Amino acid sequence: MRIDLHTHSNRSDGTTSPADVVAQASEAGLDVVALTDHDTTRGWDDAADAARGVGIDVVRGIEISCRHRGISIHLLAYLPAPEGELFDEMERARESRVTRAERMVERLGRDVPITYEQVLAQAGPDATIGRPHIADALVANGVVPDRSTAFEHLLSNSGPYHVGHYAIDPVRAVTLVRAAGGVPVMAHPFADVRGRVVDDAVIEEMIDAGLLGLEAHHRDHTPEQVRHARDLARTHDLLVTGSSDYHGDGKPNRLGENTTEPDQYERLVALATSDVGVVRGR
């Protein structure tokens, strides 16, 4: 059984619809795929409907934007009930992203050709607006050749156009995911190629709050970082997952390039206590 537990659709910063993510996952030979868009569940229903048509199981999830002392942390939440404080926090994050995008485009527009309407045109229906959509508008306007160049030269956290956005504290996020009956797993915890990462002490605080897993197998981890994640998971009896972090054409990540072992997946599903079950398409 091949299992990919981290993908994005055009409901956040992916380029592919939820239904097409599911169809492509099936075509890639996956048996299980999780849809984990940033701070939104708006692709869940479409993904569930698609699963029943192509013979693949779908795990409904979210990737929650967190921040600890200025360091970005991503928390994957699997099978949480779509209500309550967790979802209030996600809506707050979504609204903050919109405000941030508007302000960044205003700053960029003083130097390069771009409007907020052009950014919206790059986003999917009900999408969580983010920097990738700004990058896509810059590409469409011929300012840069691709997303990577846009981030490197114009949209980085240290760049002159950067504006921050609200992100929940990771310990509180873990607590809210557990309260919603979900399974919290820290995404790519040691991927310093993406920017600064927290040390083990912060992860241990998250574990004390109820963190249940680490995404060890990810393209942004070095072999040493994979080993470190696995060792930490073993010490604390955490789940170990592997995933593609697929974004469609937005990133080079390919569906199924990293996967989760079946025993870890079965344990993850068993740990969920909400009524949000796996959508059985097989």
Language-model regions: role of each:
Residues 1-71, 155-156, 168, 174-175, ...:
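An N-terminally biased module of ancient metal coordination in phosphate/nucleic-acid-related enzymes
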Residues 50-207, 259, 263-282:
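Extended substrate/RNA-proximal surfaces in nucleic-acid metabolism proteins
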Residues 255:
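Short clusters of hydrophobic/aromatic residues that line enzyme substrate/ligand-binding pockets
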